[in-house]
Amino acid sequence: MADLSNTKLNYVTFNQDHSCLAVATSRGFRIYHTDPFSKIFNSDEGNVTIIEMLFSTSLVAMVRSPRHLVIQNTKRGSIICDLTFPTAVLAVRLNRKTLAVVLEEEIYVYDIGNMALKHTIATSPNPNAIFALSPMSDRSYIAYPMPKPREDQGERRPAHAPPLSEYVPPTSGALMVFDTTAGKAVNVIEAHKMPLCCIALNHEGTKVATASERGTIVRVHSVPEGHKLFEFRRGTIPSTIYNMSFNLSSTLLCVSSSSETVHIFRLASAQNANAGGAGPAALETPGSPRANRWSRSKSIDGSEYSPSGDSDSSPRGETPEAGPSGPSAARRQSGTFGSMLRRSSQIVSRSVAGAVVPYLPQSVAEMWEPQRDFASVKIPKPTNAGDALLGPCL
């Protein structure tokens, strides 16, 4: 990717089966094979802000100007469709039957076979394009934050004022699941207490992962039933979740956030994990690096323990960074009396939870002890943070 050294990156994303990588730049776009890594297509025509592929086909969807979407056949070099929208295009997703285009207050759903508009979905203001489309067309679901109707209809507004939108920003973490084949909403999942920050559907469209604005808890529900399957603890410090992605077999979930750490969670039941020696007891044996991480976790002033919701309740923090050694570092590690007291309290809380949780029903136990990641990676901070929008992280 040396040819991108002097080019501004606008958008980076994998295709639906992660076999290709598409890169949108200020000078066209590039498409790469991931295994083995090699460039398979290059275009230097104009500024491309968003690009999405349709599996490994030659069909790509591109945004070149804020309200302008182009569907192009890269093999023939021809434009298949040219669409203009009333407001800026914030996100685009495709599967073999559906094209979904996200605006700030609407989602346009097209039949990809003939590019006919099938549905227009009104949403709450969604400037961050929080939304997901399942890659498989057999179970074609769209997931997005549940719209909140406006209670104040603005009766006292002056006549010359523009009309108010139908919905207001959501105040809860409810998730709407829309079936694009049936053309209707099929379920509302109460995923979090706080508004949603990130949504991801797995390859088959049977699971949905969600994170709230707090970013400490990640939950996985079944689709369309809405049963909670997993609950994971990303960390204790609130953070913005940028992306989540399932692997193709839906056994792993990758989460990236503003903490500059990528967490990988294993989607396995507690019984299976313990049977395979990968449960919490096996992973966090005394003296292990993960167990030692507990004692080095960062404390939060004024935090309170709450066994449910998205509260900052877990004693576990982010992966510690390697710092300088010496007397000053030793003083920082020892901390104040207050931090030592908090660490002692956390250790006692963990001991109590470890003794009590095995005797509780599973639904209650997971509230006390959400599953942790089994791997995490600390990534370097980019020189120009925010220059590129990133697609799925796995």
Curated annotation (Swiss-Prot):
SMART domains (UniProt xref): WD40 (SM00320)
Region of interest called Disordered, as start-end residue ranges on this chain: 146-165, 274-342
Regions of compositional bias (Low complexity) in chain numbering: 302-312
A GO CC annotation given for this chain: endosome membrane
WD repeat residues: 4-42, 191-231, 236-275
Listed Basic and acidic residues bias regions: 148-158
SUPFAM superfamilies the UniProt entry points to: WD40 repeat-like
Bias-annotated ranges (Polar residues): 331-342
GO biological process, one term: autophagy
UniProt short sequence motif L/FRRG motif, positions renumbered to this chain: 232-236
Subcellular location: Preautophagosomal structure membrane; Vacuole membrane; Endosome membrane
Entry keywords, A to Z: Autophagy, Endosome, Membrane, Protein transport, Repeat, Transport, Vacuole, WD repeat
Top-level taxon: Eukaryota
Bilayer topology term: Peripheral membrane protein
Self-association state and partner proteins as the record states: Component of the PI(3,5)P2 regulatory complex.
Domain remark text: The N-terminus might form a beta-propeller domain involved in specific binding to phosphatidylinositol 3,5-bisphosphate (PIP2), leading to the association of the protein to the membrane. The L/FRRG motif is essential for the cytoplasm to vacuole transport (Cvt) pathway, for the recruitment of ATG8 and ATG16 to the PAS in nutrient-rich medium, and for its recruitment to and dissociation from the PAS under starvation conditions.
Summary of the function given for this chain in its UniProt record: The PI(3,5)P2 regulatory complex regulates both the synthesis and turnover of phosphatidylinositol 3,5-bisphosphate (PtdIns(3,5)P2). Necessary for proper vacuole morphology. Plays an important role in osmotically-induced vacuole fragmentation. Required for cytoplasm to vacuole transport (Cvt) vesicle formation, pexophagy and starvation-induced autophagy. Involved in correct ATG9 trafficking to the pre-autophagosomal structure. Might also be involved in premeiotic DNA replication.
Record family assignment: Belongs to the WD repeat PROPPIN family.
Name by which UniProt lists this protein: Autophagy-related protein 18
Organism: Chaetomium globosum (strain ATCC 6205 / CBS 148.51 / DSM 1962 / NBRC 6347 / NRRL 1970) (Soil fungus)
